[in-house]
Structure formats: C-alpha cells, structure tokens
Amino acid sequence: MIHIVNLNPSIDYHLEVKDFKVNHTNRSLSEDFVIGGKGVNVSIVLNNFGVENYLTGYLGGYTGYYISKRLEDFPNIHDSFIQIDQKSRINIKMKMEGGIETEVNASGPTVDEKAIYALDEKLKSLKDGDVLVLSGSLIPGMPKDWYLKVVQTYANKGVKVFMDYASPMMLESLKEGVYLIKPNQYEFELMMNKSYQTHDEMIKDAKNLMNQYPNSRMMLSLGNEGSYLISSKNIYFAPTIKGDVIHTVGAGDSMIAGYLYGLNLGLNEVERFKMATAAATASVLSDRLAKFDKFNEYLEKVIIKEERI
C-alpha cells in the first residue's frame, strides 16, 4: 500500500491577473480554490490513475474542513489526516501575462508534541513492502530532523521511502537507505552546496553520489530541459515533450506519482521513468493535475535515452 505524508497541506487560491501593478488595486480575470500541497498532488494523480493510497498529515479549522471535504471527491484517496485546532493554510498562486507565475505560501499552523506523537503512532502501521512518500515542507513545530528519523526507522523495515523536500537533508536520507529522492536543479544545488554552470557537471556529480548508494535512485527534474533518472547502475534521460505549458504547479509531484504507478504495476526502472515523464507532461500541458487519458496520450511520446559519463 502507498502512504503519503503531507504535513502542511493548503488551499491554493489561484488568480489570473492581466497586468499586475504594485501599490495598485488589481482585478483578477479568473480565480479558483484548489486543494494543494506536494503530497496532496501526488495522492490526487494516483487517484486519477486508479491507485489507492492513504494520505496523512495535519488539518485544522474551516480551511482544513474544506480540504477534507474536497478529498471526498477522490474515491481512491483514504483521508488519514490528524485534526488539530489551528486552521490549515491558504497559499496564493498568481499567473500573469507572459506565463509569469508568482506564489505566496503561508507558513501554516504549529503542531505540538501531542500532534507529533499521533502521527508517529499512525506510521507504525507501515510494514515490509509498503511505500511511504515524504513530500513537502515541514510544518512549524515539527523537529527539523523528523523526516530523517522516519527514513531511518522505516527504510530498515523494508518500506520503500520516497523523499521530495527542498533541504540538504535529502543527502542525509541517502545514508539512511531512502529509496528515491526527487530534487530539481535548485534543490540539487542546495543539497550539494554547489552551483553548476553546465548540466554535464551536475549529472557527473549526481552519478558519483549515487554510486555510493546502490539501493537508492534520484529523479532529477530540470524543467523544460528534461529530466534524469540516476542510480549506481544507469543514467537515463527523458527530453521534454513539447507543447503549450499551461501551468507548472504539481509537475514534480506528478513525476513521483507516475513513477509510483509504474512501481505499483511491477514494471522496470525505464518503464517507471517513462510513466513519471508522461504524468508530469500531462499536468504541465493541461489546467489540472494529470488525468489518465492525457497520461496515456503522452506516454506514447516519451523517449528515454541511456547516457554515460
């Protein structure tokens, strides 16, 4: 079974503004409320692909109630969130002319020791063969090393742990047996404490890193320049499928969901990576997270190349 942790989910308030001006009253062309959070996005795409999953973290207040009600629209998602007193956050996602996207993400509520204990207890149901996805930022009040401790605990029990968290902690998670990490270029540079001038240099360092951890793999997303799946055995590259980009929110989360879909089917690494690429494309080239029909359409167009350094 797939279990997804999204500690700090949100309501994302999407606004489209034609000509945004600072220190002026601006009018939107359109607006929409969408439940969000990296783990929520992974969960929804898996739902769209017919894969059952458990989604947990913290919800509270009228915003938390709204998120919980919206999750009822997805029959393959089991709402396993822990209720807290403080309200869940609202983020602002603003799209302007020229495809410019600006985000304002709220910090969210603060959890106490009781809430942390409740989540720790919930995770104890994980067993050998399960998949655990740790996705998104830590919630205020949570120990900074909480993710790492979870990896330490469950990777040693036969749980495949995925991590998508913008922190140097991704590097530490490799030492503890994390199954897959998914940085973008910024996150990889943060993890390595280094800036890269060329992709070749970056991929070389990524391969050298993964050579040290033969049981782990890295999906490195480079936006419109494609993505890589890197392990101690291979380097695979997937060029971007061309099309009109509608929005980029949830692209990386869709990659994880696509990979999980392939894993759930028992497919090999190359097929999983193809599905990751198709799922990300289906989200980026539409106005919502990937739907199964669009996923299948783009799956036929995915090209995977093996590279060597």
Placement of each model-derived feature along the sequence:
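Positively charged, low-complexity intrinsically disordered leader regions
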Residues: 1-23
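Hydrophobic anchor at the start of a short beta-strand
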Residues: 2, 51-53, 78-79, 161, ...
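Substrate-binding N-lobe of the ribokinase-like
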Residues: 27-88
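Gly/Ala-rich phosphate-binding loop of Rossmann-like dinucleotide-binding domains
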Residues: 47, 155, 264
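Conserved phosphate-binding/catalytic loop of the ribokinase/pfkB sugar-kinase fold
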Residues: 94-128
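Short beta-strands and strand-loop turn motifs
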Residues: 103-105, 130-136, 164, 182-185
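Conserved phosphate/ATP/ADP-binding segment of small-molecule kinases
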Residues: 144-233
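Conserved phosphate-binding/catalytic region of the ribokinase-like
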Residues: 171, 200-309
